[in-house]
């Protein structure tokens, strides 16, 4: 699951943060930059990043610099269509547009997804031949169709949060994420 590889998850299990304990993290590429600063006396701004996502023709690693122009890095590398470029991962990055089309300081990845601007009529009623489901309720799960190309479509508008145990299966920390999210949705920060 996604959060299992994040530094915050490891900190939570090894040495949890509290009022008296402060924890710092340093990325591996920043460790290299610090080492080069002490060895050469110069600021090292090179980075190796991943160019990834279903809309990338040839996903691979790229050698670039901090704050690189993402339009230049992805020129001629993307499939045709209305694409959304994200500096960072699809879950923790930021959409880049116009003046913000640069690689983020702490990002090691460029993600590219197809914009999901279409609405499917009665999509909840379809057999879901090309849809992803965490619970395995769509036909694509039974047919073993993998990988499925993800888009930015959220398949609808705001709706009620139904507790079916999906969050509990992917969040590795020892708390109940459904209760936390429900409290945050209604603005009850005391309960959260």
Feature map (PLM): residue ranges:
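Buried, small/hydrophobic-residue-enriched core segments of structured protein domains
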Residues: 1-192
């Amino acid at each position: 699951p996604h959060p299992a590889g994040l530094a915050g998850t490891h900190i939570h299990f090894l040495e949890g943060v509290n009022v008296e304990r402060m924890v710092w993290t340093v990325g591996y590429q920043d460790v290299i930059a610090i080492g080069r600063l002490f060895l050469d006396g110069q600021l090292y701004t090179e980075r190796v990043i991943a160019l990834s996502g279903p809309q990338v023709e040839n996903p691979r690693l790229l050698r670039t610099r901090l704050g690189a122009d993402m339009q230049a890095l992805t020129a001629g590398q993307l499939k045709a269509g209305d694409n959304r470029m994200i500096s960072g991962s699809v879950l923790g990055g930021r959409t880049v547009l116009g003046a913000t089309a640069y690689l983020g300081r702490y990002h090691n990845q460029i993600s590219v997804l197809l914009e999901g601007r279409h609405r499917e009529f009665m999509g909840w009623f379809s057999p879901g031949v090309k849809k992803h489901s965490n619970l395995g309720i769509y036909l694509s799960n039974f047919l073993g169709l993998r990988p499925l190309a993800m888009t930015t479509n959220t398949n609808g508008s705001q709706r009620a949060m139904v507790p079916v145990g999906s969050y509990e299966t992917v969040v590795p920390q020892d708390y109940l994420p459904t209760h936390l999210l429900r409290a945050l949705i209604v603005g009850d920060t005391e309960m959260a």
